[in-house]
Amino acid sequence: MGRSRSRSPERRRERRRSRSASRERERRRRERSRSRERRRSRSRSPHRRRSRSPRRHRSSSISPSRLKDRRDDDKKEPKESKGGGSKERQLAAEDLEGKTEEEIEMMKLMGFASFDSSKGKKTDGSVNAYAINVSQKRKYRQYMNRKGGFNRPLDFVA
């Protein structure tokens, strides 16, 4: 009756050939770009490095504000160390009286004379210490009078 709407076998073959050639070209181009850059895995889980040591990132340039802060710190440090050094020497001269040679050696090695506590005393480094560590009693959840409440340990409630 009527003509079939499908193309003739010859044309179909030609078209398939041209399509495959363009696909082949595209595939080759993709392979070249893949070889240039590292091929990415398809997994979405975070990449794990083989070494467990932390990576160190160093920025080559320092922002002007950081540079200014660093200069300020450098100016402050020498003054503090000069004042602190003479104080330590004075204390060391007073502490040497009535000490044995072993105690004097310990002072030189460790930098402090005795194991005396500094609790409640004002020290140079404690100027910034404003946070208070309050230890509270532990609170536990009640499991009695509950379904499945027995034979299980008490949970700590933070």
Swiss-Prot record:
Signal sequence segment: none
Region (Disordered): 1-102
Keyword Nucleus recorded: yes
Biased composition (Basic and acidic residues): 66-101
Keyword terms of this UniProt record: mRNA processing, mRNA splicing, Nucleus
Ranges annotated as biased composition (Basic residues): 13-59
Biological processes, Gene Ontology terms: mRNA processing; RNA splicing
Cysteine pairs bridged by disulfides in the record: none
Cell compartment(s), UniProt: Nucleus
Primary location class: nucleus
Recorded GO CC terms: precatalytic spliceosome
Keyword Ligase among UniProt keywords: no
Family: Belongs to the SNUT3 family.
Oligomer status and interactors: Part of a tri-snRNP complex.
Function: May play a role in mRNA splicing.
Entry protein name: U4/U6.U5 small nuclear ribonucleoprotein 27 kDa protein
Naturally occurring in which organism (per UniProt): Xenopus laevis (African clawed frog)
Gene name for this UniProt entry: snrnp27
